[in-house]
Amino acid sequence: MLRPLFLYACTFSLICAQEILQLDKIEVEDHYSVIEERKENSIAKRIIQGEELTQYGDMNALEVLKRTPGVTIPEGKGKKGAPGKGYTKVLVDGEEISATSKRRGSPLEQISPDMIERIEVMTNGSAEYTAEAMGGIVNIVLKKPASEGKTIAKVTGGIYNEQPMASVFAQQEGKNGDLSYMFNATYADNTHKDDSSTHIDEPPSVTEKITDEEGRFRALSLNSKLIYTPNAKTKYSFDASLGVNDNKSSSDERIYTNGTLSNVIHNRDESEGVMLWTKLAGQHHISGTELAEWKLKFHQNDSDGETRSGSQLQYDDSLFRVQGAEGSYSRAQGEHFIKTGAELKRLSQQEDIRVLNNGIETSNEHQRLRQDKSSLYAQDEISIGENTVLTPGIRYENVSRDFGASSRLDYFAPSMHLLYRLSLNDNLRASIAKTVKLPRLDELSENVDSSLELNDLNHPDVSGNINLKEEKALSYEVRYEHFFEDKGIISIGGFYRVIDDKIEKLTTLEGGRYIERPYNAGEAKLWSIEMELKKSLDSYVSGLGIFGNATFQNSSLTLNDSKRPIKGTNDYLYNVGVDHTLSAYRLTYGTAYRYVGGYDDPMDENGIAESQKGYGTLDLYASKRLDSTFKAGVNLKNLTGTTIETTTKRYTSGSLVETQIDRENSEPHILFTLEGRW
């Protein structure tokens, strides 16, 4: 029976329902325990191991997530991708990231991959996590101090389109009596140089926009983690992070009308940001089968910026703050592993925006949002015989919002997960969960962001909708897994999701400018088939491993008896790659190719149709152990020189009146690393 296993597991970690799986590859080294955990645990949770996060030369956590299956990061159309702004909820050590302003970058850009222990991806909700998990949950787990003393230093340098890139990472960890500690620091200084083009055909005129952009991003991150263990039953931890950054970019936009240069617009954007995270937590083993945990947290992200576009100047200040407390109680009893918990959290967000045109103030707007959320949950992992584990749960959340006018809503989010072991090496999994997505501040605010002097279909002004309602979804998932004897896996699965009050963003032409606003469009359905293969080929070629995964998806949105796809739903995407280790030379090298399929959206309610071509990215890496202390590496990134091409068409009374084609280009770049461990 599984009862002894549950008793031992809860004593040490009390997280019995976590599945560990490497998403992108099978390491040639021994990861037998990783595969075994996937076979045994009841709630599917994919995990990218720490050693995978640095080998492809990603400079920060945001770049890491862009190559992670199951994570939604919009790209193209001149809009900066940022996870957490869509349907995928991104957490850092279980805490929601500070989303700050839609005008500024993500705090994930300040997290070095060297700080990350693993990334967990869960594609369906469970009671233990937030109900706002409509597109799944990504949890970035930061490293904890090791028991033995260790010093790590890493230097990275490279070139992107003739522009320098550099970063330095240093970490010290160890243990002194009952106190374990870890301190690390990261400094990054990266520049870039890109170009893009826009072709607008609006008879009788044809407009070409050619944009050359240069930028520089600098960031310093200081982090500490302390763990105090006075006895075998009690543990306290304190985490603190301070990050500062500044970002400067400038661009020249040359505009040609019917082949003649008609205008040149100089754009400049400068910003500074400060991020502060603190957390105090405790674990108390009440008995060999009971554990109580608590946590106090304070997070704040502050940024201010200045944007100049032609004769227009905009100042913006943003503040995002989270204060909260939570506690949980876990108990293993017979064939049950029960966990209950409660959470209180206050979120405060504010934005101040001042706009001047030719030196004259044209607007001065202030946006405020305060949200109080209380949550209760209960979850039970039930072992039924030798082959079945059932995990029911329910979560209740009560949300109070003050945004000009007050609003209050509450909801239940039940979930059910099933694991059935068909044989020693075959699993069948199924789950059903109810989730929600609450509108963000920028989606509610009716103030218009018009920071660009000239706008177009793909670069509109942005406004919100104060009448926006939350989305609610019911998600079904099923998956079959087969585990090879030689540390590999093949799986096939899929999900079906029904979404009420789906939020879609629609663009209209108002007063000669395009404005994009969110609306509750109707009932949506999204379904997908997912396949995965990871295999060690060591029996054929020593040290060789392959990996691959693919997702095929489709969608529909019903509004007033008419149907169309959900906007921007890619037809498919896939990842393939190979890794090879030459043990005699202490050398590992590999390649990975990621392709994102396009989409073709028909005309929406406002007469706008949009399509995007698929694009692929090829990366190569090699690393060599020089001796017991040093390791060197080289990364060739984006060898395909990716171009994202988006075509947008505007119709009036059924007739095509405007076509716009945007091309955003990115260049190959090379990175060199030297890492030492003492």
Q: Which residues make up each language-model segment?
A:
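N-terminal periplasmic "start-of-domain" segments of outer-membrane beta-barrel proteins
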Residues: 26-56, 84-89
